[in-house]
Amino acid sequence: LECHDQQSSQTPTTTGCSGGETNCYKKRWRDHRGYRTERGCGCPSVKNGIEINCCTTDRCNN
């Protein structure tokens, strides 16, 4: 599986996920600088106030 892994509004980059990982994620939250976005492999659990979207196809988390 190939997932996007750039932070917030940086130029898109991708990474190959290891260990048979089948999910990509896009996590979004707000801090004093505005909205922040994190992308990567997996589907981590998140705290309240953090929005997360998980998906299962190549580059689906941009």
UniProtKB/Swiss-Prot annotation:
Q: What is its main location?
A: secreted
> What is its subcellular localisation?
Secreted
Q: In which tissues is it expressed?
A: Expressed by the venom gland.
Q: Which InterPro entries does the entry mention? A: Snake_3FTx (IPR003571), Snake_toxin-like_sf (IPR045860), Snake_toxin_con_site (IPR018354), Toxin_cobra-type (IPR054131)
GO MF terms here are: acetylcholine receptor inhibitor activity; ion channel regulator activity; toxin activity
* Region of interest (Disordered), ranges: 1-22
Function, as annotated, reads:
Binds to muscle nicotinic acetylcholine receptor (nAChR) and inhibit acetylcholine from binding to the receptor, thereby impairing neuromuscular transmission.
Instruction: Tell me the organism.
Output: Naja sputatrix (Malayan spitting cobra)
Q: Which domain of life is it from?
A: Eukaryota
What is the protein name given in its UniProt record? Neurotoxin 3
Here the disulfide bonds are: 3-24, 17-41, 43-54, 55-60
Compositional bias ranges of the Polar residues kind:
1-16
The UniProt keywords, alphabetically, are:
Acetylcholine receptor inhibiting toxin, Disulfide bond, Ion channel impairing toxin, Neurotoxin, Postsynaptic neurotoxin, Secreted, Toxin
Query: Pfam families of this UniProt entry?
Result: Toxin_cobra-type (PF21947)
What Gene Ontology cellular-component terms does the record carry? Answer: extracellular region
So what family is this one in? Belongs to the three-finger toxin family. Short-chain subfamily. Type I alpha-neurotoxin sub-subfamily.
Native organism taxonomy? Eukaryota, Metazoa, Chordata, Craniata, Vertebrata
